[in-house]
């Protein structure tokens, strides 16, 4: 998906990430609370974590980030789509490094 696709989804869900999240989401830090995951949309966003520079297992269960296509739909965008356990906001972040591994989501139009 490109950012237009993600923005359509965000608008449809009224930016409530709980509707995308499934599985067990862990608190970011000890003593914190993880927001609920309802998956009412059927999206099945499982918190598989991500690889940033080196594998960081502390991201597992807490984050889910997807590569996003640029406006030409031919290259990876500088910004990624991500969900995290401590909020039910749908967020974006700069990709930031060449050594990054994120999830891939395909859509059928």
Regions picked out by a protein language model, each given a short descriptive name:
Residues 1-109:
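Conserved positions within compact, well-structured domain cores
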């Amino acid at each position: 998906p490109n950012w237009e696709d993600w923005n359509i989804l965000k608008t449809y869900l009224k930016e409530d990430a709980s509707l995308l999240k499934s599985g067990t989401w862990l608190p970011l830090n000890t003593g914190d609370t993880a927001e609920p995951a309802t998956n009412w949309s059927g999206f099945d966003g499982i918190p598989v974590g991500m690889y940033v520079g080196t594998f960081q297992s502390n991201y597992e269960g807490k984050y889910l980030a997807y590569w996003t296509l640029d406006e030409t739909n031919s290259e990876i965008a500088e910004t990624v789509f991500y969900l995290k356990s401590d909020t039910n906001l749908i967020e974006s972040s700069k990709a930031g490094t060449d050594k990054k591994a994120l999830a891939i989501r395909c859509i059928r139009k």
